[in-house]
Regions:
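N-terminal active-site segment of His-dependent metallophosphoesterases
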Residues: 1-53
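Active-site neighborhood of divalent metal-dependent phosphoester bond hydrolases
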Residues: 44-138, 175-177
């Protein structure tokens, strides 16, 4: 069956840009396949709203939702009381996520740890379904000719499907600087494409085995969408950070 596929990665709480992009490309969730490559939370302002929306999109429309490293980091910090996990999450934009759930502004320079712990407990009790949803997300999605993953695949692992979760959601240079040596094209996020070709548009590896789509929206750049048409053609779309209409695209 030939269908139009629309792929977005690294939304990072950029809820308004995400919905503006869905509207711009006229994504029809009854016909098109929407594939999301992870990192729904952290850094941006509306992580809770993004998580709620993608949960509904998967339930209602079968949208493909893949796990990213920030999603795993959030769950690890919130479901445990381990300072190392908390500090790691906070260094990577976790306070913005926390603020979207509890509407308290946390100062990263001078954290009120008792308020932080209280907020964690509240999220655990009130939003356990969010944490469970994020923790159980798949790491990869395959269709003929394409592998969709958050960070990449490890060329040093004989069968990439057996690589550890860490590679699926964290790998960088070991993946994108080397040939994959497998059939098909790997579509990935995680590494902002400006690190791959000095601008925020979708990166197409010259060898044809990789496509990087993280436009760095949470860093002030843009949110990208890769369209794989019914005929197999590739098109790229984007919304710049802050260039949005309001509301969600159903």
């Amino acid at each position: 069956m030939h269908i139009r596929r629309c792929i977005i990665s690294d939304i990072h709480g950029c809820y308004d840009e995400f919905n503006a992009l869905l509207r711009q490309v006229n994504v029809d969730l009854n016909q098109d396949e929407l594939i999301l490559l992870g990192d729904y939370v952290d850094r941006g302002p509306k992580s809770r709203q993004v998580v709620e929306q993608i949960m509904q999109l998967r339930e209602k429309h079968g949208v493909v939702v893949i796990k990213g490293n920030h999603d795993a980091m959030m769950v690890k910090a919130l479901m445990n009381d381990v300072e190392e996990y908390d500090r790691h999450w906070i260094r990577n934009g976790g306070l913005q996520t926390l603020g979207s759930y509890v509407e308290i502004h946390f100062d990263e320079e001078q954290i009120d740890w008792s308020a932080y712990t209280e907020a964690k407990q509240w999220i655990r009790s009130r939003y356990e379904h969010h944490l469970r949803f994020l923790s159980e997300l798949p790491l990869v999605y395959e269709v003929p000719g394409y592998i969709f993953v958050h960070a990449g695949i490890n060329p040093d692992v004989e069968d990439w499907r057996g690589q550890p979760e860490r590679d699926f959601i964290w790998i960088r240079e070991a993946f994108y600087t080397r040939p994959t040596s497998i059939p098909g094209t790997v579509v990935f996020g995680h590494t902002p494409v400006k690190h791959l070709h000095d601008h925020a548009d979708i990166w197409f590896d010259p060898s044809g085995d990789k496509i990087g789509i993280d436009g760095g929206c949470a860093y002030g750049a843009q949110l990208n969408l890769l369209e794989i048409g019914e005929d197999g053609s590739l098109q790229k779309f984007h919304v710049k950070k802050g260039e949005t209409g309001e509301g969600s695209a159903d």
